[in-house]
């Protein structure tokens, strides 16, 4: 990973996203390049979300990075196991552990901050309480319990809200979640192994290895 341009274009590449995240320093640089654009920072948030790939279910895989007023990385995090902290709270905790203030900061998150009380409190309230100035989200949350309410509460508290880049990558990372919320059915993946002539066993009924 040699420059910020390649980092910002990561979007849909899981492995590249993880590599890019590991290369990001707390001063907001990768190599000698300074990260400064919304696509660059959202790429970092998406790479955090990929860290929750096998962890967050049945919750969506969400990543978050917080950028201080000086343009440097203040904190980052991703959604933990069901019932555990969401990405925004993890990023706030990370910033606190590092001794960074998030007052007036910009938050990049891959899904609209939640606005309902479940096993954890509303993430939008945590961001408001922390004093962040702006939230850039990749995509609205299709959950009927949220569905724009997170954005509304943030705006009502004086926090600037933008729908930023990364929508496609965020949805693709959470196909099952979006399918359940929007269509009320799970996203089913099926693999069929067949020979070139369309059969799955020999004529005598015995099976053979077709795929690994």
Label each region the model flagged.
Residues 1-7, 13-14, 20-55, 73, ...:
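Zinc-dependent deaminase
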Residues 58-62, 85, 186-188:
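Short, basic and Ser/Thr-rich N-terminal targeting/leader segments
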Residues 62-69, 191-193:
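Short beta-strand scaffold segments in enzyme catalytic cores
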Residues 64, 73-94:
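N-terminal beta-alpha supersecondary unit
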Residues 69, 112, 140:
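Cofactor-binding loop segments of dinucleotide-utilizing enzymes, especially the Rossmann-like FAD-
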Residues 80, 110, 138:
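Conserved residues at the C-terminal ends of beta-strands
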Residues 92-117:
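Mobile, glycine- and charge-enriched loop segments
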């Amino acid at each position: 990973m040699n420059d910020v341009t390649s980092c910002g274009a990561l979007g849909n590449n899981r492995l590249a996203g993880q590599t890019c995240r590991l290369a990001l320093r707390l001063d907001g640089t990768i190599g000698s390049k300074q990260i400064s654009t919304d696509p660059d920072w959202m790429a970092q948030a998406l790479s955090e979300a990929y860290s929750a790939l096998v962890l967050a279910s049945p919750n969506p895989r969400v990543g978050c990075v917080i950028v201080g007023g000086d343009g440097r990385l203040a904190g980052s995090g991703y959604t933990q196991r069901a019932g555990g902290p969401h990405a925004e709270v993890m990023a706030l905790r990370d910033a606190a552990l590092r001794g960074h203030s998030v007052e007036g900061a910009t938050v990049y998150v891959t899904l609209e901050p939640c606005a309902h009380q479940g096993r954890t409190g509303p993430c939008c309230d945590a961001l408001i309480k922390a004093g962040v100035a702006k939230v850039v989200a990749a995509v609205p949350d299709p959950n009927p319990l949220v569905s724009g309410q997170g954005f509304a509460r943030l705006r009502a508290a004086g926090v600037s809200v933008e729908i930023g880049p990364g929508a496609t990558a965020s949805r693709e990372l959470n196909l099952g979640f979006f399918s359940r919320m929007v269509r009320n059915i799970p996203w089913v993946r099926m693999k069929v192994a067949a020979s070139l002539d369309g059969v799955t066993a020999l004529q005598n009924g015995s099976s053979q290895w077709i795929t690994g």
